[in-house]
Amino acid sequence: MSESPLVKRVLAVVAVIPPGNVTSYGEVAKVAGCGARNVGTVLKRHGASTAWWRVVRADGASHDPARAAEFWDREAIAHANGRVKMHEHGIDARELRELME
């Protein structure tokens, strides 16, 4: 079964997030043309082969902070108490669009 256009758009945006950076579900949604919850659903169903740990809530929290922390440490992404330091590592929709070009 082929992936829907929405799934392809979301996964394409997630694929351009550089190592050492994160973004929020909302920022991915702005670029993919959908809602933040749609991004979460796509990643839940199709995100196992993506860098899912680079997509976090707006406050920097992960849906699975224990697993994400392993990846954050590998990529030197500063975090504490299950939250990424967004001001240090976060990128926004404008930056994501530039990376998509």
Residue ranges and their predicted role:
Residues 1-101:
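Nucleic acid-binding interface residues in structured DNA/RNA-binding domains
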